[in-house]
Amino acid sequence: ECDNKKLPRQFSSASYYTGPLIDAHLHMPFTFDVPKALYAQADYDGAVLEKDVAAGSIMCVFDKTGVQSAIGFYVIPSLLKGQAVVQIKQIEEKFPGRITPFIMPAHVSALNIQPADVESVLKANPGLFKGFGEIGLYKDAYKGTSPDDVSLLPFYEIANKYGLVVMMHPDYGQEKAIEKIVKEYPDVTFLFHGDQLHPLVLKTDFLGRYPNAYLSVDDIFLDIQNEGQSSSLYGDKSKEEFVSKFKRDY
């Protein structure tokens, strides 16, 4: 049973936003069972929806925290695409509009969905999926793959054809390739994520020059000292000290 009583106000700032929230980066539990040994190649171990995590419990957290909806990245492996989509459709039917489904590659080379697979899923489920990604180019399955690599271009073409958003987490040193694809595909909306792009986004007018380019800002607030790659807002504070000061000052 869901206790969806709203959480009390956490911060001290007089200017306090109380409107709806959208989670722009939600990795959904798997909608299929996969041998753990196989997914060890992806260097992450995912929960299974309705087995380890109930969809209703996700919605309960949304209701408690004022999250209206979320962009949900659903892993769809090439060999299990039919099975994977079944539960995605069920969630959309049961909780319409709460999760905006994106088709996410498996980030395991042998299971990564191919352009023809993506198109077949889109044709079989018209209007269900709104984006493609997250594409994690820093992951081993994509290591050394540039955003403008010939292997990725068909996905951008499909995004253009079906009106999909492309969500990408690039690797370091890929700024020029990022600018190239954004420029060459002006009708495709690109949503980027990751501190790899901070120099380009925060120190240039990249977002101003390209209205089809967006950055999810949540990653700017990530990474507590000794628990991540950077310490942008946290500095040398402990987690507890940061939370206390953040509540006080914001």
Q: What does each model-found stretch correspond to?
A:
Residues 96, 146-250:
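Catalytic pocket-lining loop regions of alpha/beta-barrel enzymes
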Residues 18, 34-48, 129, 214-236:
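Active-site gating loops and adjacent loop-to-helix segments of metal-dependent hydrolytic enzymes
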Residues 2-6, 78-79, 83-167, 233-237:
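Active-site gating/metal-coordination segments in enzymes
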Residues 15-17, 63-66, 93-95, 124-127, ...:
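Extracellular/periplasmic catalytic domains that process cell-envelope and extracellular macromolecules
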Residues 6-10, 51-59, 80-90, 113-121, ...:
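Alpha-helical scaffolding within the catalytic cores
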Residues 27, 75-76, 104-108, 134-138, ...:
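Active-site beta-loop-alpha junctions enriched in small/polar residues
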Residues 1-83:
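An N-terminally biased module of ancient metal coordination in phosphate/nucleic-acid-related enzymes
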Residues 22-26, 69-72, 99-104, 130-134, ...:
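Hydrophobic faces of well-ordered beta-strands that scaffold small-molecule active sites
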